[in-house]
Amino acid sequence: MTNVQTQEKEKESKLQDKKSIMHIFSKIMHEPEILGNDREFPLETDDFVEPFHRVIFGAMKNLYNDGADTIDVIDIDGQISNYEVPYNIFNQNNGVEYLQTIKETLPPTNFELHYERLKKY
């Protein structure tokens, strides 16, 4: 990655609305079927700038694709623990605590608003 590319990634990371990401993760944990609505709300790993968020979203998407009706913190941790580098990223960012806080404190509301904010950047 060139210096210019690195600077662009850092800029994108600062612009991305982290609260919206947290609300999106809350919605997915409470209602994973939202990931099946690709026509109205297409979400991909590339929508997330930070590796930490990419790891979490990738695990959620894999769990949904494997048929999970619900997704909780233990499921996500278990999914990521199979892969050394992503699991290190997850743990270095206190992933379990981060997701527990999201699930316990953020209601899965206003998804459309947060989705639009995520897609804006």
Protein language model annotation of sequence segments:
Residues 1-121:
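Noncatalytic partner-interaction/assembly domains of nucleic-acid and motor enzyme complexes
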